[in-house]
From Swiss-Prot:
The organism's taxonomic lineage, starting at the top: Bacteria, Bacillati, Bacillota, Bacilli, Lactobacillales
GO molecular function per UniProt: ditrans,polycis-undecaprenyl-diphosphate synthase [(2E,6E)-farnesyl-diphosphate specific] activity; magnesium ion binding; manganese ion binding
Protein name per its UniProtKB record: Ditrans,polycis-undecaprenyl-diphosphate synthase ((2E,6E)-farnesyl-diphosphate specific)
Top-level division of the source organism's lineage: Bacteria
Organism: Lactiplantibacillus plantarum (strain ATCC BAA-793 / NCIMB 8826 / WCFS1) (Lactobacillus plantarum)
Signal peptide range: none
Length: 259
């Protein structure tokens, strides 16, 4: 049913046949490899981030065209503040440049912007760019482009537990009534319902770890790791990752239909 190409080879443009009925509703991507991409070309790390921003634009449109409902991109983690100051300052400027140049295309493609993370800790100009993008695309009802910005899964879970504890303390919730749905509603992905949890998680650049990203939400996600660095990631690479996803038998803890 499917024709695959090597998802580790960005130069391989062999067509991939996808089942349009089995496109993952929520795709999450850990965008990794910008710095190594730049280093391999004897460029400063920020050059990799700039090229990575261009990749975000291309993949956003590609995912929307494929019928993805939510595209979540890990843009900046709570741990990324440990990077060199010049690099952090550049990364904080990227959302401003991105939204200034790309919001018209998002509106044209009916894509709505959502941001999760501790946005109030970001520089004022970055916060303003985020707020404007959300406001400008609020009437779009196609794919949601969800940025994880100053986000960390452990911090998210702590914040969610604090919300639930406050509800219990205020008499709004009984301890015995706390269940999966309670936790889902307390997490930063709640506004994405019913697509809170990624169906497919992709990490680029050959690293095979989760890096404090959506740890509650990926309990039953399919994971695809590709050697392709984020600036080299193309629509064809995305299609190959989705083809890999479609080749799998998702069991959600149960038995395979073939056994």
């Amino acid at each position: 049913m499917f024709a695959f190409f090597n998802k580790n080879d960005p130069a391989d443009n062999t067509d991939v046949q996808l089942d349009p009925e089995r496109i993952p509703a929520h795709v999450a991507i850990i965008m990794d490899g910008n710095g190594r991409w730049a280093k391999a070309r004897h460029l400063p790390r920020v050059a990799g981030h700039k090229e990575g921003m261009n990749t975000v634009k291309k993949i956003t449109i590609a995912a929307s065209d494929l019928g993805v409902k939510v595209l979540t991109l890990y843009a900046f983690s709570t741990e990324n503040w440990k990077r060199p100051t010049d690099e952090v300052n550049y990364l904080m400027q990227l959302p401003v440049s991105f939204f200034d140049t790309f919001v018209p295309d998002l509106i044209k493609n009916n894509v709505r912007v959502q941001v999760m993370g501790y946005v109030d800790h970001l520089p004022e100009a970055t916060q303003k760019a985020v707020q404007n993008a959300i406001a400008d695309t609020k009437d779009c009802d196609g794919m949601v482009l969800n940025f994880a910005l100053n986000y960390g899964s452990r911090a998210e879970i702590v914040t969610g537990v604090q919300k639930i504890a406050q509800q219990v303390q205020d008499g709004q919730l009984a301890v015995g009534d706390i269940d999966d749905a309670t936790i889902d509603a307390a997490l930063m992905t709640a506004p994405l319902a019913p697509y809170n949890d990624p169906d497919l998680l992709i990490r680029t650049s050959g690293e095979e770890r989760i890096s404090n990203f959506l740890m509650w939400q990926i309990a039953y996600s399919e994971l695809v790791f590709t050697d392709v660095k984020w600036p080299d990631f193309t629509a064809a690479t995305l299609q190959a990752c989705i083809a890999d996803f479609q080749s799998r038998d998702r069991r959600f803890g149960g038995l395979s239909d073939h056994k």
